[in-house]
């Protein structure tokens, strides 16, 4: 088994070190990750400049690009052998509901969709690393179990782990994505020279976070697993759109 590990927190982040340590004796693991924090990069590719991989002392490969760049290069010649699966994380911070649209953690897993195995993205609901051992243990268990899993092609599992010691985790729930309320307005700032700028505000609170959602599961102490697919076609809208288009051209 060969696993490509990436993230969006950066190659020196504690989460990717914990994930690699958890998987290193299970599979042949290669780490390719951004050289700096690329949270919120989504599935962006770097197309305006060359990418320069650099192998660090610990064997991890640092790249001056996005999480998707990292996986794309890993699957297209940077590694001597093609990985069997992609595992992303462990992100310090939730990737729930609408977060998946912006998440570089989820995007890295999505870039592995062409492989035969199911890719996984792991996130811990904390900005602090205290419970990374919990997340790393759960990641190891799920990666081991993935070999017995048969899902449709191009499926990614988005895994969110409560910020709890392992003994307080109540179990695992399969969930759908919830939805967040609209984020607050960006914060306007002015630097000492009078130049204006803006900080993007934090994500909105859960607006659709009832039973069955990823929000609800983690708030109740359960690990949330949400299967994701790339196809965002809204099939239920076809009937209304057919009528709307009639006679336009």
From Swiss-Prot:
GO terms for cellular component: cytoplasm
Alphabetized UniProt keyword annotations: Cytoplasm, Hydrolase, Metal-binding, Nucleotide-binding
SUPFAM superfamilies xref list: SurE-like
Chief location bin: cytoplasm
EC numbers, comma separated: 3.1.3.5
Keyword rRNA processing: no
NCBIfam families: PRK00346.1-3 (NF001489), PRK00346.1-4 (NF001490), surE (TIGR00087)
Function: Nucleotidase that shows phosphatase activity on nucleoside 5'-monophosphates.
Protein family membership: Belongs to the SurE nucleotidase family.
Name of the protein this chain belongs to: 5'-nucleotidase SurE
Organism: Pseudomonas putida (strain ATCC 47054 / DSM 6125 / CFBP 8728 / NCIMB 11950 / KT2440)
Designated gene of the protein: surE
